[in-house]
């Protein structure tokens, strides 16, 4: 299947071991791409035997992870990077500005904002040499709203929108596109892994209940999104099928972004 015209393209995908990242990696490989997958978890068993898949284990909150990941990609596939999918992310505990801990703030900003920017910093010089490249960041409903998550997650995802738009404008004349896809709640993403639900800011959660319920009803009606649904959106914006689209903020949430 080559429906996305990425045959032999070299694509870096973060969060590749589960959820949206795994679905996107699987679809990219099926479309003929060569993928460097990055994750803090183990390499996904379903992809390990694929000769076009290289796995790089990394905690993206570490300062040198981005640089080392790009070096691993070059070692595997040469000095060519066609695409970057910044998918890896972590949730907060819905903590408000008056309750957020330093650790929670630092981790959300490090993984959800700093790591994507560092990876873009590393791949853009390679893309500039080729005169072409496509970057797709993964945001959230929280990229456009202050009423769905805590202050750390919200700030990190708002910041990623700004970084996306800046990259899109700055490199628009060099064939490099940058967009951000903003999912709503997606089943089996793994983004809540390691989150202690008993530590959620219950007062803040109560304020957001009506917003969350509006989206939860989609799943109850069988309209909820799966990781594979997001993978198709991501591959579309990564590929030349979306030529001319850059700096866009694209909600993929069954209209949740309208409220």
UniProtKB/Swiss-Prot annotation:
It comes from the Eukaryota. One of its GO terms (biological process) is terpenoid biosynthetic process. In A.calidoustus, the austinoid gene cluster lies on a contiguous DNA region, while clusters from E.nidulans and P.brasilianum are split in their respective genomes. Genetic rearrangements provoked variability among the clusters and E.nidulans produces the least number of austionoid derivatives with the end products austinol and dehydroaustinol, while P.brasilianum can produce until acetoxydehydroaustin, and A.calidoustus produces the highest number of identified derivatives. NADP(+) binds at residues 13, 59, 121, 153, 157, 186. GO terms for molecular function: oxidoreductase activity. Transmembrane segments: none annotated. The gene is ausX. Short chain dehydrogenase; part of the gene cluster A that mediates the biosynthesis of the fungal meroterpenoid acetoxydehydroaustin. The first step of the pathway is the synthesis of 3,5-dimethylorsellinic acid by the polyketide synthase ausA. 3,5-dimethylorsellinic acid is then prenylated by the polyprenyl transferase ausN. Further epoxidation by the FAD-dependent monooxygenase ausM and cyclization by the probable terpene cyclase ausL lead to the formation of protoaustinoid A. Keywords: NADP, Oxidoreductase. SUPFAM superfamilies: NAD(P)-binding Rossmann-fold domains. This is Short chain dehydrogenase ausX. The active site is at 153 (proton acceptor), 153 (proton donor), 157 (lowers pka of active site tyr). Its EC number is 1.1.1.-. Pfam families: adh_short (PF00106). Belongs to the short-chain dehydrogenases/reductases (SDR) family. Pathway: Secondary metabolite biosynthesis; terpenoid biosynthesis.
């Amino acid at each position: 299947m080559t429906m996305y015209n990425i045959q032999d393209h070299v694509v870096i995908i973060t969060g590749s071991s589960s959820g949206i990242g795994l679905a996107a990696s699987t679809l990219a490989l099926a479309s003929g791409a060569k993928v460097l997958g990055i994750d803090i978890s183990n390499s996904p068993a379903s992809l390990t035997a694929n000769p076009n898949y290289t796995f790089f284990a990394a905690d993206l909150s570490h300062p040198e992870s981005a640089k080392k990941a790009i070096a691993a990609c070059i070692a595997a596939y040469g000095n060519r990077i066609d695409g970057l999918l910044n998918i890896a992310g972590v949730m907060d505990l819905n903590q408000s500005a008056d309750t957020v801990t330093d650790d929670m703030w630092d981790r959300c900003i490090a993984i959800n904002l700093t790591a994507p920017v560092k990876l873009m910093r590393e791949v853009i010089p390679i893309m500039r040499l080729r005169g072409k490249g496509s970057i797709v960041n993964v945001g959230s409903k929280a990229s456009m709203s202050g009423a769905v998550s805590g202050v750390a997650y919200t700030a990190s995802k708002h910041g990623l929108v700004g970084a996306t738009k800046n990259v899109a404008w700055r490199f628009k004349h060099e064939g490099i596109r940058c967009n951000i896809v903003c999912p709503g709640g997606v089943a089996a993403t793994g983004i809540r892994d390691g989150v202690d639900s008993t530590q959620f800011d219950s007062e803040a959660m109560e304020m957001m209940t009506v917003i969350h319920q509006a989206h939860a009803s989609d799943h109850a009606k069988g309209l909820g999104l799966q990781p594979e649904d997001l993978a198709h959106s991501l591959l579309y914006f990564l590929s030349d099928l979306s030529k001319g689209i850059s700096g866009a903020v694209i909600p993929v949430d069954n209209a949740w972004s309208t409220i």
